UniProtKB/Swiss-Prot annotation:
GO terms for cellular component: plasma membrane. It comes from Trichophyton rubrum (strain ATCC MYA-4607 / CBS 118892) (Athlete's foot fungus). The chain crosses the membrane at residues 543-563, 571-591, 603-623, 627-647, 652-672, 684-704, 789-809, 1222-1242, 1248-1268, 1296-1316, 1336-1356, 1363-1383, 1489-1509. It is a multi-pass membrane protein. Glycans are attached at N149, N157, N356, N810, N886, N903, N1244. Pleiotropic ABC efflux transporter involved in the modulation susceptibility to fluconazole, voriconazole and miconazole, 3 azoles with similar molecular structure. This is ABC multidrug transporter MDR1. ATP binds at G918, V919, S920, G921, A922, G923, K924, T925. Signal peptide: none annotated. Keywords: ATP-binding, Cell membrane, Glycoprotein, Membrane, Nucleotide-binding, Repeat, Transmembrane, Transmembrane helix, Transport.
Amino acid sequence: MASQPPQPLSGQPVTQYEEYQSEVITETTNRPTPAADIYEITPTNDVMDDRYEHEHDDYESGAMYETVRTWSPQSRPELVRIASVFSRVDSHPNVTPTTEDGGQLNRRDTLAGVKIGDPVLDPTKPEFDFYKWARMFTHVMENEGIKRNRTGVMFRNLTVLGSGSAVQYQDTFLSPFAAPFRPGELCGKGRNPEKVILHDFNGAIREGELLMVLGRPGSGCSTFLKAICGELHGLQKKKESIIHYNGVSQHTFKKELRGEAVYSAEDEHHFPHLTVGQTLEFAAAARTPSKRVLGVSRKDFSTHLARVMMSVFGLSHTYNTKVGDDYVRGVSGGERKRVSIAEIALSGAPICCWDNSTRGLDSATALEFTKALKIGSQVGGITQCLAIYQASQAIYDIFDKVIVLYEGRQIFFGPTRIAKQYFEEMGWYCPPRQTTADFLTSVTNPKERIAKEGYENRVPRTAVDFERYWKQSQNNKLLLANMDRFEAEYPPEEGHLQKLRETHGQAQAKHTTSKSPYRISVPMQVKLCTVRAYQRLWGDKSSTIATNISQIMMALIIGSLFFDTPQTTDGFFAKGSVIFFAILLNGLMSITEINGLYAQRPIVVKHVNFAFYHAYSEALAGIVADIPIKFLLALVFNIIIYFLGGLERSAAKFFIFFLFTFITILTMSAIFRTLAAATKTIPQALALAGVMILALVIYTGFALQPSYMHPWFKWILYINPIAYAYEALLVNEVHGNRYRCATPVPPYGGGKNFACAVAGAVPGEMSVSGDAWVESSYDYSYAHIWRNLGILLGFLAFFYFVYLMVSELNLSSASSAEFLVFRRGHLPKSFQGSKDEEAAAGGVMHPNDPARLPPTNTNGAAGETAPGGSTVAVIPPQKDIFTWRNVTYDITIKGEPRRLLDNISGWVRPGTLTALMGVSGAGKTTLLDALAQRTTMGVITGDMLVNGRPLDSSFQRKTGYVQQQDLHLETTTVREALRFSADLRQPKSVSRKEKYEYVEDVIKMLSMEDFSEAVVGNPGEGLNVEQRKLLTIGVELAAKPQLLLFLDEPTSGLDSQSSWSIVTFLRKLADNGQAVLSTIHQPSGILFEQFDRLLFLAKGGRTVYFGDIGKNSETLLNYFETHGAEPCGPSENPAEYMLNIVGAGPSGKSKIDWPVVWKESEESRHVQQELDQIQSETSKKNEGHGQSAEKEPGEFAMPFTSQLYCVTTRVFQQYWRTPSYIWGKFLLGLASALFIGFSFFLQNSSMAGLQNSLFSIFMLTTIFSSLVQQIMPRFVTQRDLFEVRERPSRAYSWKVFLLANIIVEIPYQILLGIIAWASLFYPTFGAHLSSERQGILLLYCVQFFIFASTFAQMIIAGLPDAETAGGIATTMFGLMVTFNGVLQKPNALPGFWRFMWRVSPITYTVGGLAATSLHNREVKCAQNELAIFDPPTGATCAQYLQKLVEAGAPGKLYNPTSTTQCQYCPLSSGDQFLGGSEIHWSDRWRNFGIGWAYIVFNIFATVALYYLIRVRKSSGRPNRIISVIMYHLSRAGTYCRAFITGRKEKCPRKREQIVQTYKEFNMLLN
């Protein structure tokens, strides 16, 4: 039915403004004087008499703050001193004058209600009272003439636009090929259409008011808050949109006073290794004003304020605890949220916008947080907006105003006390016990709202209808009139701007420009950030130490590799290699800074928005803090590599060497920092860094000499800072030195009749000048050394300047609207055209519809509000009863035992819905994990039975577990995820057709038809929070759990309506025979009544109550009231009532020990009796039915082959639908191979040309590290899903998981090998090679890339994350390429390292490729490579060299008949050249076989490491196994080294002892 335009209901008053006006004037005279913020406060005598803008406050001054008490921190002397100074204000000259009314001090004491020396002013004392402290602080500031900014905000015609449509299509590997057939998308049209996020908003918020922002997820709440603060970042306001702060335009306000309006994002971003105290003291120091009360120092002032905020938000006990994050252990999630809150409070901003800041807090903590905000508004005059999804009535009543959003449209703005009446007068029904906030949000949900009788066809239905109704209402007219008065009171850009400037200027430090939004000067910012940088380093000192140790170890390895290099011409190549290594390792050690800068970018952006500091101040501080550390590391690193690597031991040359290497470190650090600052994402930065490193390495001058560079790429040499450093170091090393000729030609010549076969040699001289050698070989000159230093310093200054500039300019990231992603050709009809959302929801609900109202008894039907409008009768009824008795869970933390669960008993019957609740830290999730058999550590005792029998291996497969984290594979669709679960978790006896039909039933049950073909995606680009939660539930239902369904916080992060939908759906499942046990977070009263039974836990995992809830919670409430609790009010939420009486919240306490009461109660004894009865009844049934038909229940539902097929198909699918990964892989191989190929394009047959050809092969292997870094994150994504959800559910085996990931990588690696082969070898070697040799090269290329993938999986298999594995893989790769025989010939390796050349897999890859490419290639020496000399008088060149030729010399004489200027080339074929590196054509197939042996080893090692480290981790034996393996491998290594090197050393272990090793290993495995 078509929607009718809404009309105001005739005959009914819309507002109560007449009586409201009389209330507000009385109320404002009694309200506490507002001030600027919670710690620096200026009073005002203004009386706000606007009848619309101020509602009556039901709280007496200070009465509502009784619960805002704090946890006492340990006293610190300086804080005690500050508190004592504050308590002795009478000694301060500015506050001691005596007046007729008793003096200012007496006024302050009377107003604050404290006496001198009162401990309520000391945040280190338990008696500290924040409200009294704030009142005292206000008047001290007034007495000293300290002003603080305060302002309201008005917005008119606010319209915000974003890019993106409601629907996007999923890209696949072939999408780029199909793009030409979609020219509209190719040109960008239709790809990112403009979307209106906020439509024409109007409103005004006076200073000191609290605004509640209500709306369902996706309605625009976050965008609205960002718009108020001016932090749209990629979104756009329409030109007509007006936002001003008491007359100051948003543009001017954000430019000059940015930190005065701040936005608190829903996510927390902090430096994880800083402590809570360091984090908050930094925030306080960054906003410390220049003029401070009582003249205290900056440090004392900021420390005191940080302590105050920690005390207010219950963080005092965490002062020395790291903040932490998902990977670093620190404070809890709730405490981290409070750190974010305290940080904003310390910013002192007069306008604060909080985006769902109560998420993750229990109801008691959320209420205390809201009351603290009220203190800031009433006492400090702070204007605050809070978006909240689940708000209790107590929280709602604290707010002054509320705005309701519906699909980006404003449908109400006004005082909180009239909002409910407005919608009721519109025609909507509010059920009893539903909170006002829930009611206001519910009217925006077609499936939840209820129309009053007689108004079904008169109420608005769509968002546009609601907006139209609002704009026609009297409330909106009064709002617009009030906005006109607001604008008249604060004319644009007039007096208020000047006041703000004056107040801001008073707070600014010296040397800060008047229009700067910052309070402290740039030098102060840099100093503050530098101190913080060192605090971060100290907090993460283990990582810093590990990094430095790895660098030092690399220096030791490289130095020892070139140890004892001969000081002859044979050492020229080694000197070039060691200097190349030194400059390269010094220069590239800073590449890890890219990840570090991206990790801190969200924090820097946040702090810049808070006006803590300039982004370039943090960047400059990072540089300053790094220089001493880099200096020390460079000093140790270069001392080792210089003296161990055989370089000249001259003080002057060493210090020049160190100078250039250190400047190179700084220059490359500046380049990598600039790269990170100039890009938007880590993949962008790393991709550019990879290409840049390849270019820097090739065009350093070592791998490819300048004279052999082609013009199309030679320009890279001139912009390569490493090239200038390499030239300087090489000429510095050889300058002024002469090197004995190692290979004179002929060796028996005398006088002028011989020459050294080295570039730069002079005929007849037995030594070669180092200067002549570098000039002839590289065209280098010692005269360039200081020129190069100047060029390096120029690079350094340039990139530092660019880095600081882009750091300041490139902070924001583009924002776009949320959208669903579908596969092409699978767009639902509902998205192909418009639809009536009300009709889609089943029409308008009626208040007396029994399907809509909450059930009136525990067995009543919960109907249409559940996600599914269809029946759930397809759920098979269950008969099994799950019981647990005296369950105890103990773990050991830091050597101390700790009990998490303490003798908990209970049961879950089929057809019942049981709630698991408790205070924060009570162990709700821990109990759920223990019952579901998902714990991996500790000791669990007690009885857990199904029908009186112990749990078998199939228990986890037969239960469903809906985890709190909605973890899904982002590339799969909803239907595919459900089918995957059904395929693997339903028994093999069920046909695939039946499984898929059941999946369709699940989709209908959960009302997922509209997005069943949608791709899961990532937040913002895929399913929203509610849809993800439904999918999580659907995945478990698709498995058809035969026993029961566990759910952990299924409503977490959802709005109240979505929570209601989820719980009522669970109600329907229970009514149809499903057994359900669910933890629930902060349920509303009507939601709580959906449950049949409650298990309530106190801290320490102790039981407070287990039993029936009863109708209207009577059974539950009677228990608490009969045992001494205060009666529950008729309108009070029973769930919140329970939390309050047991002392939940940071400051909550209870006089009654409820776990002890429960233990001694009759109800507890009844539970034990009931458990006995259940066990007795089920035992009799078991005896009557005999043994179970399933004698040996299997761990998995499907056989191994079926598992492997399903999982491999899904992994293939994931790869195919991740084109960025596949194309990134292919483009890396293609671009790198083409770049290398055309850099070494068609090298000639000179000795240098052969060396360059060998280096081209070597350079191909260097992309190994980038390939490995690409593969590992993809593996981790699959592994996280498997280990967190699918392995505990026994969906498939860990062996299947590993094999599927190995198998899927291989085809892509084969294709990548073909691409690299064609792109590299044809440009480098041409097409003249035989087809056989081209085929061998192709086989080696394919093998190399398959080896890379299996190596990556071997490394990541047992390690926790890709970052850790990446570091290890890079180190191992460095060793492999170092010892492959290219950079140091095998015969020149020290004996200790020769075995490394043999065990390096790259040795055999390079050997096979080089032998195949250069076999039988004729050598034609370049002019500077020839040994040119005159033969004795009367002899020809052939006659003179006949003796040398007869001795089997490998060279070739070019002019045998000449009698002068004999030209002798030391080599005649490529095989001779390769022989020096022990590379032989005859070994090509042996090397190929060894390569496959390494691949097989990688696969077996992958399986073994994963099993030992991750599968058996719960047994506690992996560490013992690894220890045994490592110990005996070291012994075996000694034996193998002795065998390979041919030395007569024996393995220290006898053969019998090695046999014993295998026995020990087998015992551990068994």
